[in-house]
Swiss-Prot record:
Database matches in InterPro entries: BTB/POZ_dom, Ion_trans_dom, K_chnl_volt-dep_Kv, K_chnl_volt-dep_Kv5/Kv9, SKP1/BTB/POZ_sf, T1-type_BTB, VG_K_chnl, Volt_channel_dom_sf
UniProt record similarity statement: Belongs to the potassium channel family. S (TC 1.A.1.2) subfamily. Kv9.1/KCNS1 sub-subfamily.
Cellular component aspect of the GO annotation: nucleoplasm; perinuclear region of cytoplasm; plasma membrane; voltage-gated potassium channel complex
Membrane topology: Multi-pass membrane protein
Region (Disordered): 497-528
Bias (Polar residues): 519-528
Gene expressing this chain: KCNS1
Record note on quaternary structure: Heterotetramer with KCNB1. Heterotetramer with KCNB2. Does not form homomultimers.
PANTHER family: POTASSIUM VOLTAGE-GATED CHANNEL SUBFAMILY S MEMBER 1, VOLTAGE-GATED POTASSIUM CHANNEL
Biological processes per GO annotation: action potential; potassium ion transport; protein homooligomerization; regulation of potassium ion transmembrane transport
Residues in the Extracellular compartment per record: 240-270, 323-341, 400-412, 433-439
Descriptive protein name: Delayed-rectifier potassium channel regulatory subunit KCNS1
Function: Potassium channel regulatory subunit that modulate the delayed rectifier voltage-gated potassium channel activity of KCNB1 and KCNB2 by altering their kinetics, expression levels, and shifting the half-inactivation potential to more polarized values. While it does not form functional channels on its own, it can form functional heterotetrameric channels with KCNB1 and KCNB2. Each regulatory subunit has unique regulatory properties that can lead to extensive inhibition, significant changes in kinetics, and/or substantial shifts in the voltage dependencies of the inactivation process.
Length: 528
């Protein structure tokens, strides 16, 4: 009897769970409580086999429960299996209960690839998305690297690993050949310094005219004149090395020593001397003008091109100072002092070769080459290391094979010259092996040099191509700015970016509100 009572009680308790609870009014009548007011009523808020309606960035689709059940660990799979509306709302950005539609403020292009993933089980990389943005989207939807298709996995991993190491850590280049926003921001900060400066607007225009050949017509004319002066200076330096001018200079020096005059008696050709003075005057005008117009004197002396300009005129003034000092301290030793002064002049004249680098201010290729060398120090270091190891090894082998022969292989340091020439495949032919073992060592040295030099050179060449394309893209962006001035273009880029971002957000919010308010007006979504 007791057993029956216990069983009956247990049966009543279980049965009571299946009967909806009711409330008793004042007359004693029972009325059922609505499902929404019953906590944990156990009635599902949507059928588990019902298709899932989603709206991702304005793209509406309906995904079948069977397709989502194949991937329960994804965000949409967990959304399909959500036990309550509150749990589902945690997985989406918004939910329209009237239409039964879930809204996600995410990239619609990636969502189309996500649909393909639910069909085939493989995810393909989108070229229009940055590798990091693609990874963020994949993480948001609950997809791992294992979901990537075999045809895209290697490319994705290579791009993801290479970008931070090559571009971010070393500050080499951005991910594309588009103009770099960091460089534009640097120019903006420089231009902003003129706002509080005296005659800031005029100084800014003059500075842009001298620094940017594509800024205006006067800047193009100034650039052409500057290039012409540089070429004339280089031509004068080359002409001065001709034998007839060297003989003229030597005769003048001898006449000076015989006459007992000071160093002022040595004179170059009058035409070349006047041309040199004109070039120095122009270079001095450029340096002083850029220094006076520069927004920051500290940044001026840190810029490589400005340092090249200073070095190009420094030898002339150092020569003048040396001549003045020599002329003021003559005590009957004119010949010896003249000899020392001639050596100093030769050294300073040799420094004039740096004027060739002034063309980098007007050449995209030279600037790209400088940027490539700046950001390829690792590759250059690897190249030098490979050459040092190869030269050391093959020089020792050549010394062992050729030390008995009188062919210039007397010591290992003497063999380093031969090893360097051979590994770089130059082959002057001044020192050659004659024994069979020496020839075999030379063959290995040449073949090893081809392999060793080719590996880093390829990487450096790829970087140069990237920098060159990026520089050309930046110049094209300046040229295609139309009637707007360059500083207006630069000052508006940040504002345009922020405005575009705000407009995009407003459009996204308006599109989402319109989607939620009038879902019936949209076309019937497809079921996947």
């Amino acid at each position: 009897m007791l057993m029956l009572l216990v069983r009956g009680t247990h049966f009543e308790n279980n049965w009571s769970k299946l009967i909806p609870p009711a409330t008793i009014d004042a007359l004693g009548n029972e009325s059922p409580v609505p499902d929404s007011e019953v906590p944990n009523s156990g009635i599902p808020w949507r059928r588990s086999d019902e298709a899932l309606s989603v709206n991702v960035g304005g793209v509406r689709r309906r995904l079948s429960a069977r397709a989502l059940a194949r991937f329960p660990g994804t965000r949409l799979g967990r959304l399909q299996a959500a036990a309550s509306e509150e749990q589902a709302r945690r997985l989406c950005d918004d939910y329209d209960a009237a239409a039964g539609e879930f809204y996600f403020d995410r990239h619609p292009g990636f969502f189309l690839s996500l649909l393909h993933f639910y069909r085939t089980g493989r995810l393909h990389v989108l070229d229009e998305l940055c590798v990091f943005a693609f990874g963020q989207e994949a993480d948001y939807w609950g997809l791992g690297e294992n979901a990537l298709a075999a045809c895209c996995r290697a490319r994705y991993l290579e791009r993801r690993v290479a970008r931070p190491r090559a571009w971010d850590e070393d500050s080499d280049t951005p991910s594309s050949v588009d103009p770099c926003t960091d460089e534009i921001s640097d120019v903006q900060r420089e231009l902003a310094r003129y706002g509080a400066a005296r005659c800031g607007r005029l100084r800014r225009r003059l500075w842009l005219t001298m620094e940017n050949p594509g800024y205006s017509l006067p800047s193009k004319l100034f650039s052409c004149v500057s290039i012409g002066v540089v070429l004339a200076s280089i031509a004068a330096m080359c002409i001065h090395s001709l034998p007839e001018y060297q003989a003229h200079e030597a005769a003048a020096a001898v006449a000076t020593v015989v006459a007992g005059r000071g160093a002022e008696g040595v004179r170059d050709d009058p035409v070349l001397r006047r041309l040199e003075y004109f070039c120095i005057a122009w270079f001095s005008f450029e340096v002083s003008s850029r220094l006076l117009l520069a927004p920051s004197a500290r940044n001026f002396f840190c810029h490589p091109l400005n340092l090249i300009d200073i070095v190009s005129v420094l030898p002339f003034y150092l020569t003048l100072l040396a001549g003045v000092a020599l002329g003021g301290n003559q005590n009957g030793t004119g010949g010896e002092e003249l000899g020392h002064f001639g050596k100093v002049v030769q050294v300073f004249r040799l420094m004039r070769i740096f004027r060739v680098l002034k063309l980098a201010r007007h050449s995209t290729g030279l600037r790209s080459l400088g940027a490539t060398l700046k950001h390829s120090y690792r590759e250059v270091g690897i190249l030098l290391l490979y050459l040092a190891v190869g030269v050391s090894v093959f020089s020792g082998v050549a010394y062992t094979a050729e030390k008995e022969e009188d062919e210039g292989f007397a010591t290992i340091p003497a063999c380093w010259w031969w090893g360097t020439v051979s590994m770089t495949t130059v082959g002057y032919g001044d020192v050659v092996p004659v024994t069979l073992a020496g020839k075999l060592a030379a063959s290995g040295c040449i073949l090893g040099g081809i392999l060793v030099v080719a590996l880093p050179i390829t990487i450096i060449f790829n970087k140069f191509s990237h920098f060159y394309q990026r520089q050309k893209a930046l110049e094209a962006a300046v040229r295609n700015s139309g009637h707007r001035e360059f500083e207006d273009l630069l000052s508006s880029i940040d504002g345009v970016s922020e405005a575009s971002l705000g407009t995009s957000r407003e459009t996204s919010q308006e599109g989402r509100s319109a989607d939620l308010e009038a879902p019936s007006q949209s076309p019937k979504p497809q079921v996947y």
